[in-house]
Amino acid sequence: MHTQNDSSGLPSIAAVVSHDVTDFDTWQRAFDGSSAARKGAGIVAAHVNRDAANPNQLSVYLASNDAERLNAFLSSRDLMGTMRDAGVKGPPAIAMITPVEDQTVKDRPLAGAIVRHEVQDFAIWKRAFDGDSDARRKAGIIGHAVNRGLKNPNLVVVYLQAESVDSLRAFASRPELKAVMTAAGVIGAPDISFVTGGAWTN
């Protein structure tokens, strides 16, 4: 099992690009074909997630160490043309995030959950998240990543990995989770997307 947990090796910035596609296989071929363009733009890692209920709804994670080059890539006409030709439906939603911790499993595709919520204080929330590690492990959560919103650092985006979506759904619906999140200072109800993750590439 390969995980990355050295914070010094984290990329400095990342984008989560969400959109629907007409046909995933067509889109995947175009995505694979643009690998050189991503590398040329300074993107060091890419990970595609497909919504568990709607496999043509995608969330694409792109990591970089150069915010200017990443933004230029995301706003380029070449990318817009590639996405259009790949069957992307409508304009993508782009969320810029700052990676904080990466303990994801990268040696095989896994089910995932993308959890988004605001917190009152990130440090307090992180202590509570770390304190819940045994519960995650017992629930079959084998990998995770923590990110903060670039414009709003109290917006937290957590990526959880397990062998099955059912394990993630069971963890998210456990009765005590609401109390844990309330004590951690989570504001409002979290937004949770269950996904199937693909291979990690660049």
Residue spans for each PLM region:
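Short S/T/G/P-rich N-terminal loop/turn motif that feeds into the first structured element of a domain
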Residues: M1-N202
